[in-house]
């Protein structure tokens, strides 16, 4: 660690001590909310900041009253904070765990692609999904780790976080569309090309500064949900070609529906800011809406993973298009 980083760490420790020993009579006011800092458990405040002590660029959810890391202006200190408890801890560790799991399968894809009839196309489409999941979870982990660095770095990380979501949605579609329309190449190309085009448009929107503003929270959730709901069209199309029972395994449809359910539930919780909206200050470190959103995303990603594996197995059990 350089001398400048050591100095920054000492300055940060001083800020944390100041926050810890702040007058117990302080009252935090956020809109119509008024919460006394004496009501916030000391374990949640030690070395951390409260809402009213934040810089404007750090303020996003007024119902999260405490547990904020001070601006660090140091990537080293941001990474070091991973091993401390604060209101980003759950967000960081849930998606870090998921990123590690998907990275493992990227390098150990033979654990999934076990069929003798596996082709280069199988390797490609499944690797695309695994990489997209890793990208989304990795970008999310990165953003929540460095979100307290500085205004500019936080903005960059936030945009990267949203781009990761777009990559995940597009990457999730590709293996499902590949196996659903494996024997209908024109339809497969049409749907894959369409979702990639939609992804480019949404990604461009994510780069706009206004997209990350707190008032855009419900619109962000809606845009990503609508992007995912594009999947309704190829499913309806596939039902006109195949029986419902066949679609269940050809696309791993049950698991895709479960994935969609968890994504939608997570997005609704995220947009409505529940449960912290009902009891500001109670869910600052554990149990806030963003944390539940992260849990839903992890579960959804693994549901989709299982569905893709079912589609892969079914395709090779039927020996490709030979028996279709």
From Swiss-Prot:
Pfam families assigned to the protein according to its UniProt record, in alphabetical order: HlyIII
Cellular compartments annotated: Membrane
Gene Ontology molecular function: metal ion binding; signaling receptor activity
Topology feature Cytoplasmic, residues: 1-91, 144-162, 210-221, 273-291
Family assignment from sequence similarity: Belongs to the ADIPOR family.
Domain of life from the UniProt record: Eukaryota
Protein known as: ADIPOR-like receptor SPBC12C2.09c
Regions that span the bilayer: 92-112, 123-143, 163-183, 189-209, 222-242, 252-272, 292-312
Keyword presence, Lipid metabolism: yes
UniProt keywords, alphabetically: Fatty acid metabolism, Lipid metabolism, Membrane, Receptor, Transmembrane, Transmembrane helix
Role according to the record: Probable receptor, which may be involved in metabolic pathways that regulate lipid metabolism such as fatty acid oxidation.
Biological process per Gene Ontology, one example term: fatty acid metabolic process
Keyword Membrane applies: yes
Entry GO CC: plasma membrane
Main location: membrane
Record membrane topology: Multi-pass membrane protein
Extracellular side: 113-122, 184-188, 243-251, 313-324
InterPro entries assigned: AdipoR/HlyIII-related
Record-annotated disulphide pairs: none
């Amino acid at each position: 660690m350089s001398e400048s980083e050591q100095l920054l760490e000492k300055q940060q420790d001083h800020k944390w001590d100041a926050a810890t020993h702040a007058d117990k009579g302080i009252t935090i006011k956020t809109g119509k909310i008024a919460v006394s800092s004496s009501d916030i458990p000391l374990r949640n405040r030690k070395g951390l900041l409260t809402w009213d002590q934040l810089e404007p660029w750090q303020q996003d959810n007024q119902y999260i009253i405490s547990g904020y890391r001070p601006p660090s202006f140091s990537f080293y200190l941001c990474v070091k904070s991973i091993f401390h408890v604060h209101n980003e801890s759950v967000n960081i560790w849930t998606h870090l765990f998921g990123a590690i799991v998907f990275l493992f399968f990227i390098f150990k894809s033979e654990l999934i692609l076990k069929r003798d009839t596996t082709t280069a196309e199988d390797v490609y489409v499944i690797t695309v999904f695994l990489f997209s999941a890793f990208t989304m979870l990795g970008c999310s982990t990165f953003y929540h780790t460095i979100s307290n660095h500085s205004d500019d770095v936080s903005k960059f990380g936030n945009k990267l976080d949203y781009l990761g979501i777009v990559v995940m949605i597009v990457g999730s579609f590709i293996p499902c569309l590949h196996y659903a329309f494996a024997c209908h190449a024109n339809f497969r190309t049409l749907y894959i090309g369409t979702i990639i085009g939609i992804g480019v448009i949404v990604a461009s929107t994510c780069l706009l500064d206004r997209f990350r503003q707190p008032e855009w929270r419900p619109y962000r959730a809606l845009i990503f949900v609508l992007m995912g709901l594009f999947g309704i069209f190829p499913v309806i199309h596939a039902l006109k070609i195949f029986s419902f029972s066949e679609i269940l395994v050809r696309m791993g449809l049950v698991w895709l529906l479960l994935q969609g359910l968890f994504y939608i539930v997570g997005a609704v919780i995220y947009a409505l800011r529940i449960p912290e909206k009902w009891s500001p200050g109670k869910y600052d470190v554990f149990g806030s809406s963003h944390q539940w959103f992260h849990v839903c995303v992890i579960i959804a990603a693994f549901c989709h993973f299982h569905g893709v594996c079912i589609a892969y197995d079914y395709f090779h059990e039927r020996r490709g298009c030979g028996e279709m």
